[in-house]
């Protein structure tokens, strides 16, 4: 059998003392903020259900179809309608959009082509 020396005992005690001195690693989310969107809650427990509804994920309470389920109520309507002047639109209606009918024969200049490192590579 191998005989333990003082050096071996010192190594063993230092290893155990280091393990005892180390604090436990903190949880990943120490400050959860919103517990629904943090990692403090187990995703399997995020379901909610009442006697009138089926179980549903808390993170996704509404679907796209639920946003348009109710028609707008009168208290959401604006009180006054103030149309803006349509001068720009009227000008476009009479003159049309700008058309550039010139012929583009010049080389395209980009930063890559104009860079001194790439000037003689083409």
UniProtKB/Swiss-Prot annotation:
Function of the protein: Microtubule inner protein involved in the attachment of outer dynein arms (ODAs) to dynein-decorated doublet microtubules (DMTs) in cilia axoneme, which is required for motile cilia beating.
Subunit structure: Microtubule inner protein component of sperm flagellar doublet microtubules. Interacts with CFAP53, ODAD1 and ODAD3; the interactions link the outer dynein arms docking complex (ODA-DC) to the internal microtubule inner proteins (MIP) in cilium axoneme.
Region of interest: Disordered: 1-26, 99-122
Basic and acidic residues compositional bias, start-end: 1-23
One annotated Gene Ontology cellular component of this protein: axonemal microtubule
Protein's GO biological process: axoneme assembly; cilium movement; determination of left/right symmetry; flagellated sperm motility
Pfam families in alphabetical order: PIRC1_2
UniProt xrefs under PANTHER family: PIERCE HOMOLOG (PTHR20899), PIERCER OF MICROTUBULE WALL 2 PROTEIN (PTHR20899:SF4)
Compartments, as annotated in UniProt: Cytoplasm, Cytoskeleton, Cilium axoneme; Cytoplasm, Cytoskeleton, Flagellum axoneme
Top-level lineage group: Eukaryota
Main location: cytoplasm
UniProt name for this protein: Piercer of microtubule wall 2 protein
Compositionally biased region (Polar residues): 113-122
Organism, as annotated: Mus musculus
Family of this protein: Belongs to the PIERCE2 family.
Keywords: Cell projection, Cilium, Cytoplasm, Cytoskeleton, Flagellum
InterPro entries in the cross-refs: PIRC1/2
Effect of a null allele: Mutants born at the expected frequency. At 8 dpc, they have a reduced beat frequency of nodal cilia. The motility of tracheal cilia in adult mice is also affected. 25% of tracheal cilia axonemes have missing dynein arms. Double Pierce1 and Pierce2 mutants show high levels of embryonic and pre-weaning lethality. The few mice that survive birth display hydrocephalus and laterality abnormalities, dying by 20 days of age.
